[in-house]
């Protein structure tokens, strides 16, 4: 399966008739060793200014290409939001194949996930969730904002402000402004109501 077949993770469909147009993307590289198949194949996608950026949520690998050649390997540029040391993964026993035991062996090392992604002409913006378990829980989990320079391929990571004692975080995200710039934000619930706080924009 891993060596003889393609493993697309995303697809586009035609507006006219809804039929499949293009399949693209690939499984995270650790899927072969862990035998987890599509279990950790979550993807994030954004399109802006006729460019597409998409990433393996658990693998951290990012691809960007013109929308018109989204399935062209030679037309893509590649970046990374974070790295995974695949030597940490145990190879499952064959008796565990086709079972959730393969997932259980891999999941302790998949403690980061790209929750949102956006691009502009200069940067790729990523919202990183630091996972505590399979269920997203903004009130107890921490998030980071990662910004990647598309020209130099350098990466910076920023923390969101700590929660105050009277605050309950209910969500995080990336917002595109009218001029195309991207701003991270978080949503809080307090006694006075719900507030949305932007962080940045960071230039």
Labelled PLM ranges:
Residues 40-44, 112-117, 165-177:
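Repeated scaffold domains used in trafficking and secretory/extracellular systems
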Residues 1-4, 128-141, 189-199:
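Short, conserved, GDST-rich strand-edge loop motifs in beta-rich repeat architectures
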Residues 104-150, 154:
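Loop/turn-rich, solvent-exposed surfaces of beta-rich toroidal or solenoidal domains
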Residues 4-65:
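Loop-centered beta-sheet repeat module
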Residues 18-40, 71-109, 159-170:
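Surface-exposed loop and turn segments in beta-propeller and other repeat-based domains
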Residues 174-203:
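Blade-level signature of beta-propeller repeat domains, shared across WD40, Kelch, NHL, RCC1
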Residues 5-17, 64, 140-153, 196-203:
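Beta-propeller blade signature
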Residues 49-51, 121-124, 179-182:
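Short coil/turn segments that connect the beta-strands within blades of beta-propeller domains
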């Amino acid at each position: 399966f891993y060596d003889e077949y393609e493993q697309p993770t995303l697809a586009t469909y035609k507006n006219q008739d809804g039929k499949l147009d293009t399949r693209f993307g690939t499984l995270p590289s650790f899927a072969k060793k862990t035998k987890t198949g599509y279990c950790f194949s979550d993807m994030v996608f954004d399109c802006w200014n006729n460019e597409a950026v998409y990433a393996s949520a658990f693998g951290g690998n990012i691809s960007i290409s013109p929308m018109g050649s989204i399935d062209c390997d030679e037309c893509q540029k590649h970046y990374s939001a974070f790295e995974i040391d695949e030597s940490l993964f145990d190879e499952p026993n064959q008796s565990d194949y086709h079972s959730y035991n393969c997932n259980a062996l891999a999941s302790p090392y998949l403690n980061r996930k790209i929750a949102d992604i956006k691009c502009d002409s200069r940067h790729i913006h990523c919202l990183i969730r630091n996972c505590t378990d399979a269920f997203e829980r903004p009130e107890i989990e921490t998030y980071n904002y990662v910004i990647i320079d598309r020209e130099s391929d350098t990466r910076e990571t920023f923390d969101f402000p700590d929660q105050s004692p009277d605050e309950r975080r209910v969500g995080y995200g990336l917002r595109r402004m009218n001029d195309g710039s991207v701003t991270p934000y978080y949503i809080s619930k307090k006694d006075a109501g719900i507030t949305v706080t932007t962080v940045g924009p960071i230039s």
